[in-house]
Regions:
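Short, structured protein-protein interaction patches enriched in aromatics and acidic/basic residues
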Residues: 71-97
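A short, sequence-level motif marking secondary-structure junctions
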Residues: 47-54, 88-93, 112-115
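Short intrinsically disordered terminal tails
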Residues: 1-4, 131-132
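N-terminal intrinsically disordered, cationic/polar leader segments
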Residues: 5, 12-23, 38-45, 49, ...
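Short, surface-exposed beta-strand/loop "edge" segments at domain boundaries and coil↔beta transitions
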Residues: 41-45, 82-84, 101-109
Length: 132
């Protein structure tokens, strides 16, 4: 799996919080390591931009969040597989989910309260990569 669940055991069962941080925490020639921190824990996952342009996906996700769209995803792919962050829903209720390559859901967040905060966080991540 291209992600590591670094959360305390059993902390995901009632996670309805928005993400607190999404950042690139390591950069190598062929890989970016992302860390997603949310109310009950954190994930780390790797992406190889040569396999799939995850930064372009994140830019599209931020655009969709800001425009109120009801379905968008970002894919983070490396030699070991992929992680998909998915946003879906309608009107004022959105569900955010994280899936591994086998399609198993990894708990993430839910609720419209996180929409703009998540878009802002993604924009900050993208700006940091432009400066790198």
């Amino acid at each position: 799996m291209p992600y590591q669940d670094a959360s305390p055991a059993g902390q995901h069962f009632m996670n309805f919080s928005r993400p607190l941080a999404l950042a690139v925490v390591a950069r190598a020639a062929d890989a970016l390591t992302f860390e997603l921190i949310y109310g009950f824990g954190q994930y780390r996952f790797d992406a190889d931009p040569a396999r799939h342009d995850c930064l372009a996906d994140l830019a599209q996700m931020a655009d969709a969040l800001e425009a109120g769209h009801d379905h968008v995803e970002a894919v983070f792919r490396d030699a070991d597989g992929e992680i998909r962050l998915l946003l879906q829903g309608d009107d004022d209720v959105l569900q955010f989910a994280c899936y591994d390559g086998a399609g198993s859901v990894l708990p993430w967040l839910q609720g419209d309260a996180g929409r703009y905060a998540t878009a802002r966080m993604i924009r900050e991540l993208l700006a940091s990569q432009d400066a790198a």
